[in-house]
Amino acid sequence: KMHREPFSVSLDFLMKLRHGGHQVIAVGTTSVRTLESLYYVGVGIIEEGEAKDVDQWAPYAREYDYSLEESLDAIIDYLKARGETSLRVGTRIIIVPGFRFRVVDVLVTNFHQPQSTLLLLISAFIGGEWKPIYEYALAHSFRFLSYGDSSLLFRAE
């Protein structure tokens, strides 16, 4: 079971994200999980009227027909109606191949250990290209984990 990551996102950031019209660059896998969880928080508000934590398997439970804009609008309206300036919830979301990315376009991250859930996220994000990238990193003695080398990854279409 994925651990819960609490997060807080400001109303100002949500409004910029909603109306930005530009690529979203996440720094780190926790940022990816946070940003992608926003969609499911918005869906929860649309369908149940409240902002709740995102369950580990929520993205895979069924098809979701709401647009990202509808989801973000729901969060923004929810916060404004309550006079709140930030969203505070948590996520247990796991991102594996087959995940539909709705928010993040580019990821800056370090290299993750083989057979980790974070490598599953990388595989979901860039598709089959993860393997040659990691083979290159291993062959050239790149450092892994928190103080290791980093990579700039673009989402597979």
Language-model-derived ranges and their functions:
Residues K1-E157:
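Surface-exposed, charge/polar-rich loops and edge strands
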